[in-house]
Amino acid sequence: MTDTNLDFLAMSDPAIAEMIQQELQRQRDHLELIASENFTSAAVLAAQGSVLTNKYAEGLPKKRYYGGCEYIDKVEQLAIDRAKQLFGAAHANVQPHSGAQANFAVFLALLEPGDTIMGMDLSHGGHLTHGSPVNVSGKWFRVVNYGVNRETEQLDYDLIREIALKEQPKLIICGYSAYPRIIQFDKFRAIADEVGAYLLADIAHIAGLVATGHHPSPIPHCHVVTTTTHKTLRGPRGGLILTADAELGKKFDKAVFPGTQGGPLEQVIAGKAVAFGEALKPEFKTYSGQVIANAQALANGLIKRGFKIVSNGTENHLMLVDLRSIGMTGKQADQLVSEVNITANKNTLPFDPESPFVTSGLRLGSPAMTTRGMKEAEFIEIANIIADRLLNPEDEAVKQDVKNRVAALCDRFPLYPHLNIPVAAIA
């Protein structure tokens, strides 16, 4: 959103303008450690606040049901071309409104109600759309779950193979919302081929790492790949479908429109195009490497302070802190760090005895604060800040000290310094 747009908003609707200004200030003043969140560039914000929001464009480039799409076609085609180049895919659909919508379109294209799907148990790091009973994926299909090894807390490919051989799924899903280790897509493909299943990789969390070669790519191994375009990819909130099989790609296109969506959000697609262009630059590869280095610095810093990290570390952008060793729940820890302006989220652990509303874990991620420019030294300081807070929950002096250290870090790495809504216009 440009300064001009903010000026217009402040004059037209001061109530909303004030709320946006308050949210901007919250983002500036907090250490954002939610693993699924990031800060887009000003260019992505501007694209999403553009006149493209005015245009209906059902269909695909050059195959629209509405007139006046000649420039919309150029925008969407550029997004498609950049996505294909970025991920090395033969086909890309940039229209899904979200990662959940992308997954649903894949299900519609490949499955019939009652078919068997196999995905990771939500409590082990899976996702709602991978077969949770409260999601449409768990209501329309027969769901078989796999999890991590109790001892290593990592994927056990031999056990996954045993489950697949027994259950004969039509679709196997890999890719997770809370798994800190490298995914071996080639091993999943061997299992899928053995049972005659399609293989879907949901790389929503690791897309930016995959795009820059910091995580193995699923494109050569999986029939279809879905992702969000925010998180480590640092684009607008949206979804994306990729495949190396152009013929399968046609099925996914039809499953998106008219199968599950109507008009695409072309202003968001423009934001995706901008983000893909940014991700193709050398600076983004440097950023992705720093995301991993920072996550490892944070994990190692917490380990040095006596905390247990699930699987004893991380190879990507996130980690799970097992709080049982300090007698604390995820809910309690979430509240304690929130009180000192740190944003994280409680999270279930593998074999967690607590409910999803309480949990035994805290999920932390490095993408957002890496975007603000922080490096290993700052993430070691963040580890100590978190440790000081959680190990001294009743100490008001420690609480204030920690809050001051958070403020100092945020001040050193400003967020969107060019964005401000005129206070006079709001008042």
Swiss-Prot record:
SUPFAM superfamilies: PLP-dependent transferases. The keyword Iron does not apply. CDD domains: SHMT (cd00378). Keywords: Amino-acid biosynthesis, Cytoplasm, One-carbon metabolism, Pyridoxal phosphate, Transferase. One of its GO terms (molecular function) is pyridoxal phosphate binding. Its EC number is 2.1.2.1. Pathway: One-carbon metabolism; tetrahydrofolate interconversion; Amino-acid biosynthesis; glycine biosynthesis; glycine from L-serine: step 1/1. Gene3D superfamilies: Aspartate Aminotransferase, domain 1, Type I PLP-dependent aspartate aminotransferase-like (Major domain). The modification N6-(pyridoxal phosphate)lysine is found at K231. Its cofactor is pyridoxal 5'-phosphate. It holds the Pfam family SHMT. (6S)-5,6,7,8-tetrahydrofolate binds at L122, G126, H127, L128, S355, P356, F357. It comes from the Bacteria. It is found in: Cytoplasm. InterPro entries: PyrdxlP-dep_Trfase (IPR015424), PyrdxlP-dep_Trfase_major (IPR015421), PyrdxlP-dep_Trfase_small (IPR015422), Ser_HO-MeTrfase (IPR001085), Ser_HO-MeTrfase-like (IPR049943), Ser_HO-MeTrfase_PLP_BS (IPR019798), SHMT-like_dom (IPR039429). The record marks H230 as: Plays an important role in substrate specificity. Its main location: cytoplasm. One of its GO terms (biological process) is tetrahydrofolate interconversion. It catalyses: (6R)-5,10-methylene-5,6,7,8-tetrahydrofolate + glycine + H2O = (6S)-5,6,7,8-tetrahydrofolate + L-serine. GO terms for cellular component: cytosol. Catalyzes the reversible interconversion of serine and glycine with tetrahydrofolate (THF) serving as the one-carbon carrier. This reaction serves as the major source of one-carbon groups required for the biosynthesis of purines, thymidylate, methionine, and other important biomolecules. Also exhibits THF-independent aldolase activity toward beta-hydroxyamino acids, producing glycine and aldehydes, via a retro-aldol mechanism. Homodimer. Belongs to the SHMT family. This is Serine hydroxymethyltransferase. It comes from Gloeothece citriformis (strain PCC 7424) (Cyanothece sp. (strain PCC 7424)).
